[in-house]
């Protein structure tokens, strides 16, 4: 057992020795080179000092111009040849300071440009250009670094002073130009005032004078007109126009007499025609003809039974005779004759096809045409697939079925066009196999070029317009139901009353029996409803007119009036882009060409088969010769079929007794009707009596009207004369009033023009005042704070003479002359190795002596837990003591300033406790695997240190736990980040390590875990 323990101890010791030697070699190589570089940088003057520039400046605006002094500062440094400058991010600069890549980091703050342009401020804020030097620099290198920063800052301050002087001169120059502009604007205002207002106002009274003259003339004419009109009215006698309404005028009487005579004459003529009807109709002839037809039908019916057998016998004899003639016919071609004819015909056709030059030329022409057609078809397929630069729209995208569905096609169409795309890919592969690499073709990549676009529906929407007229006696309510996928804007007018387009119920005026409905609005698609809308691509709006609160009675058969005015807009056309139709057209065109290509493929070089053509022609002729016997048999079969169907045919012709009987009955009825008509014509018609004496009453009606009509005519003539005179006066008045109206319109137009000009002039004057006020305000700011009372503003003077100050972002380390400062990397490595040794000591003791039991388990069942707590406490206390010792040594070695020492020692103690507790737990619990994990963490740290680059942290640095501890100490020593969160995390890790050591599970059998 002891031998086995010594073997473990020896292995661990060798591993620790190898790790320490490797660490010393690595540190000597890395940091010795850095120290050597530091010494060489002193000897090689300033060009070996690497300076990292971190530009955090944000642009600002001054006098309407964009100012970026941070960029100007960097450009200034780019011309500097004595030092090596690099513009990097803050993280890269800090990493460079840590690993020796940079000696100085200069930070241009965020408000650098804003603070630098404080020429108008009374007390300008100080501008600080921040810088930081690397930890552990030699005193001579640090002095050179300070000198470099000072020189760069002095040069930049000189440039800023030049910028300030240029800005002041520009302000004065702008003021000079603005004064000239003010004078020009004032001159323009005066000129416009004269032309726009002064001259038109001087001409304005003339318009009033013309209007007054025309008004006086019109007033005189109106007075004369009314006087004449009154005179005519006063001289007229109202009795003159009164007519006795008991009588009609003579013209009415004459018209009535004429109409009476016409009707009387028509009546006489009708009576004469009625009397002569019986003489003009020959009914006896019609009746005799029908009776003769009836007798013939009787004879035909009696002959049907005797003629049927004769028909059958005649048909049978004719068919038998025809059958004998056909059976007697024999084929003129014997079998030997047919074979000889086959042989001779074959030889003749072969000779004709072989020696026919026209046929050979035709075959060659067909072959050439097929080759040319195949070449043209292949070129067309190439053009269908490939997209030519700029102008070509007939090409094929490499689209899938899902792409077609997303573009708006249904599943059936998507399957169809997906198959065409696969054909295009198949042809592309065949084409590329035949062509060199430079001529290969490919389908155009698809990137949603033909996807559905709903932006126009979301932004512009779709117009909703409808006009209807609804008539009903019982409609009293309107219900509006809108599409939930759209936002509606607009209104619904019902008999002129407006209602918003939204989901609502509106009570209508029941006094109206007719409703004029006008819908006018816009429906815009909701962004969150785009997916649901694309399922049917239809906008719905329903207006339902009906009755509210109607209760139907059981016996009420009157239906409820409901009028549904529904607007359905299919918006599929608003979704598809032109690219979709172009793509589908290109696919259809390729499909047609490809089918032609597959039909003609493989037939171009196939020779013409003469033998097959000859055999086909000879076989056709021989078949015709041999088919004589078969044709004869077929004809005989047809004759037999005719004989079988002859009885039925004769029965159909002769057995029509029912139709004959019906015709006989109809003829008998017609004869009876004609007999009745004949009796009616034989009777004498009764002549109506007409009283012609009534016409005498109209002859006495016009005698009393002649005198009154004459008197009315005279007065009408006089009234017409007065009216004509009144009309001429009215025309004159109308002309005068029109002139007055024109003058008023001129006054109105002139006044309106004057108002517009006055408003324009007022706006221009207001704009000029605003520009002048702005200039005065801005010019007032120029150097307004250049003096403080009667004295010069010393703060502004000091700022403009030396605007930018340098600010050292001091480290927590004290400068100790030429003494080298230990690196945080070496410090962390030493702490970790010390914790590994401590953990192994605890593990070896427990392995040799067993678990530490400070309290015997016999006294209480909980003593085992107390022993675990005490064991964890001993391990943690050991880490605390080691951390205190290491912290005191490192504090003196790092020369930490007085205000930072307590936090530094606390960080070291917590870090050391974490290392000791975690490493001890790994060895106690998982033994060899724990040792492997500890060494793996150490190896990751070595790799991270070796691969550390100025460009940032690598992947190894991110997964290495020790790298985070290293960064923690580096940031603290450089006073970059607060450590409050770091202390909390370390405390939590200490508690976790303490608890883990309390619950160690001991296995009964020794085994490798």
Curated annotation (Swiss-Prot):
This is Type VII secretion system accessory factor EsaA. It is found in: Cell membrane. Its main location: membrane. GO terms for molecular function: identical protein binding. Residues 680-707 are annotated as: Disordered. Residues 680-697 have a biased composition (Basic and acidic residues). PANTHER family: TRANSPORT PERMEASE PROTEIN, TRANSPORT PERMEASE YVFS-RELATED. It comes from Staphylococcus aureus (strain Newman).
